[in-house]
Amino acid sequence: ELNLVGPNSSLAYIKSHHQLTVEQLMEGMLLPSGNDAAYVLAAAGGRILNPGAPTARDEVDAFLMGMNEYARTIGLCGSHFTCPDGYDYPENYSTLEDMALIARLAYEDEIIRKYSNLPSDRVTYYSGHIMEWKNTNWCIDPYTPEYYIPEMNGLKTGSVSKDYYCFLGSVEIEGQSFIFGFFGEEKMTDRFLDSKTAVQWLKTYIVK
């Protein structure tokens, strides 16, 4: 399944001889935005949904079929998924409203909460290999003070091209939780600067 990862993808640098737990693969998606981790998990899920799938492509497709069925059950109205990693493939699309709903549901998961709020980690794979991962969300890293937001506790970056960046952020301000997002930022860092503006707006006008 690793050979299905699109060109110029962000990676967790997983190799075919590595062995990782499901939790480590989730961390590999959340910190370095590893598209390779997403495909490994998708293929594993597809093997459960379709045990007789003859190829990795068929396994991933079985996962995507289940993914789209689940999307409908949770009320996504403007989304259709043709890849497990958010890559810019034909007919793979969503809306900010749908992504916000996904983010709200995802943040109920303990593993997602744990790793989406982790600036970096040194990971020892199940196979014993060691990897250093850094979170692509600079708003949670105090060592990037220009973008750091103390109230932020997640969630996920994304990009479609070198001039189309996305972000879903989660913050807690005086006991209240908020999720917000940006699609179509022209510069990678704009999403972090706009997040600081959004959080300041929340603190000024919403949380009093």
Predicted stretch roles:
Residues 2-45, 130-145, 152:
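Conserved catalytic neighborhood of penicillin-recognizing serine enzymes
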Residues 1-2, 91:
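Conserved catalytic or metal-liganding residues and their short signature motifs at active sites
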Residues 43-208:
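Penicillin-recognizing serine hydrolase domain
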